């Protein structure tokens, strides 16, 4: 199939394009930097580098005449500070709707965009696709509004919409300030790590498994084996955060001191996603265990 992927050189985008090319799909990789696309995937006849700013997505059909699936991953301002910027998130939402309209002009059979666990707001309950949403950050508010706007546009232009509600993804290329990246860096150096009590439940999904899930889900929806709509994107491994941290130390053979309780947090929230809907749609959720993912990241 022919895939259009915006944000193709980003964290999740690169993993997705890698996987799509690996299993034989044709990819139109949309990025602000054509040179970066060419550097990531040189001499591959199945990839087409498309240079386009997010504000210009409405003109993408001038460079791409037809495709099967449009996966919109580009989203400006994903740092902690930017997630509270209402103006920036509003621009993101407008770009998403432009992308959806142009996907219809390309005769795509499916439009895919990414939501977030931030749509729910703080919670310690198990979350499902039907759980109530009470976002507190502009980022979560915009993702939820994007869902509503895309669903309305989906009906208006008759283009199925897939809303990937991402939970907690990790892997090479992620922001260096994330817990996993920070812990790996300090563990490999044997440096002490200040942590909260880490008693809450959490769920980590390896970015390569995320790419696998996206492709499998798109294929299932295209073949009418699954319905479009909201899907929680997570792994089959939910447990205490402390269990993850202890496993990281063991796998990386680290001597780092783990200072539980050194970081005081005002609000402790868990991430406990129900993945039954996704599992029913695609079957197996993971190709990598947490340990296998950590080892793969060191290659």
Regions found by a protein language model. Name each.
Residues 3-23:
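N-terminal Rossmann NAD(P)H-binding glycine-rich loop of SDR-like oxidoreductase domains
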Residues 6, 68-73, 113-114, 232:
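Rossmann-fold scaffold of SDR-type NAD(P)-dependent oxidoreductases
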Residues 30-35, 54:
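N-terminal Rossmann-fold cofactor-binding loop
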Residues 51-91:
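NAD(P)H-binding glycine-rich loop region in Rossmannoid oxidoreductase-like domains
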Residues 72, 76, 97-138:
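Conserved Rossmann-fold NAD(P)-dependent oxidoreductase catalytic core, especially the SDR/UDP-sugar
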Residues 142-145:
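Active-site helix of classical SDR
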Residues 148-202, 207-216, 247-249:
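NAD(P)-dependent short-chain dehydrogenase/reductase
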Residues 195-299:
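C-terminal substrate-binding subdomain of Rossmann-fold SDR/epimerase-dehydratase oxidoreductases
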């Amino acid at each position: 199939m022919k895939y259009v992927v915006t944000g193709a050189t980003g964290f999740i985008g690169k993993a997705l394009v890698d996987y799509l090319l690996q299993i034989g799909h044709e990819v139109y990789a949309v990025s602000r930097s054509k040179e970066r696309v060419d550097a990531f995937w040189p001499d591959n006849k199945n990839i087409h580098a498309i240079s386009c700013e997010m504000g210009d997505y409405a003109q993408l059909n001038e460079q791409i005449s037809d495709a099967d699936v449009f996966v919109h991953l580009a989203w400006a301002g994903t740092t902690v500070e930017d997630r509270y910027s209402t103006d920036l998130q509003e621009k993101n939402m407008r770009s998403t709707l432009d992308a959806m309209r142009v996907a219809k002009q390309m005769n795509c059979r499916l439009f895919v965009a990414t939501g977030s666990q931030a749509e729910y707001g703080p919670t310690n309950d198990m979350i499902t696709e039907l759980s109530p949403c009470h976002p507190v950050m502009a980022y979560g508010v915009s993702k939820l509004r994007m869902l509503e706007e895309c669903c309305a546009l989906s009906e208006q232009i008759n283009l199925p919409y897939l809303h990937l509600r991402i939970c907690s993804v990790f892997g090479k290329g992620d922001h260096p300030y994330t817990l996993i990246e920070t812990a790996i860096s300090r563990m490999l150096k044997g440096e002490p790590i200040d942590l909260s009590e880490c008693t809450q439940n959490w769920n980590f999904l390896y970015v390569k498994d995320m790419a696998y899930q996206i492709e499998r889900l798109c294929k299932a929806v295209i073949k009418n084996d699954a319905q479009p709509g909201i899907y929680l994107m997570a792994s089959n491994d939910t447990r205490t955060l402390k269990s993850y941290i202890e496993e990281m130390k063991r796998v990386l053979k680290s001597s780092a001191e783990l200072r539980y309780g050194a970081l005081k947090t005002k609000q402790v929230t868990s991430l406990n996603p129900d993945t039954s809907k996704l599992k029913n749609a695609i079957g197996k959720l993971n190709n990598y265990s947490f340990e296998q993912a950590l080892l793969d990241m060191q290659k």
